[in-house]
């Protein structure tokens, strides 16, 4: 192996270790959950998952905000709402999220997760909202125990009703206001 190859390998190893340290920190730091839980306490009784209303959109926006702004890099977050209206949350890499190394979120709570799951929400930080092949496999594997699934992306919400297999795609577009100043004599 020449010196250049050795240097590249050393840099790759350092990047890998930094990524591992960064992931460990993301898993152990639970402060990102607080704003989500706080908003949940205010609006949990009125959530409309498949056809999100203003309150639901505000809650979903907070989840997406945490996934893109709280961590060192944009990280996927998943939030599960069980049949008792309890939240179960985990954080992952920019491209994948699971409960690996975060099992306490599922089993270390006062009240364990109860099926069916009302909604499985996860983010695609800084990307479009879409259901990937992995996402569809997750939806299919929970068939009968999952009522709805939502993917949050950059200015987008993709909500899916598992029973009807109907989805709703919402895209937020910032437009100019269209306002102009009315001068004397115009109306």
Label each PLM-derived region with a short phrase.
Residues 2-119, 126-187:
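Conserved beta-strand-loop surface patch within small alpha/beta domains used
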């Amino acid at each position: 192996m020449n010196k250049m190859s050795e240097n590249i390998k050393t840099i790759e190893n350092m990047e890998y270790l930094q990524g591992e340290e960064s992931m460990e920190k993301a898993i152990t730091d639970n402060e990102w959950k607080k704003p989500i839980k706080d908003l949940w306490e205010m609006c949990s009784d009125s959530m409309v998952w498949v056809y999100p209303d203003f309150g639901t959109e505000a809650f979903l926006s907070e989840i997406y905000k945490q996934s893109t702004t709280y961590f060192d890099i944009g990280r996927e977050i998943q939030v599960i709402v069980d049949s008792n209206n309890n939240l179960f949350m985990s954080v992952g890499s920019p491209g994948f999220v699971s409960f690996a190394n975060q099992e306490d979120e599922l089993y270390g709570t006062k009240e364990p997760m109860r099926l069916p799951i009302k909604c499985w929400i996860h983010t695609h930080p800084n990307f479009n909202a879409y259901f990937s092949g992995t996402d569809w496999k997750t939806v299919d594997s929970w068939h009968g125990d999952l009522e709805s699934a939502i993917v949050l992306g950059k200015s987008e919400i993709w909500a899916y009703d598992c029973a009807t297999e109907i989805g709703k795609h919402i895209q937020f577009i910032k437009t100019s206001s269209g306002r102009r100043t009315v001068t004397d004599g115009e109306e």
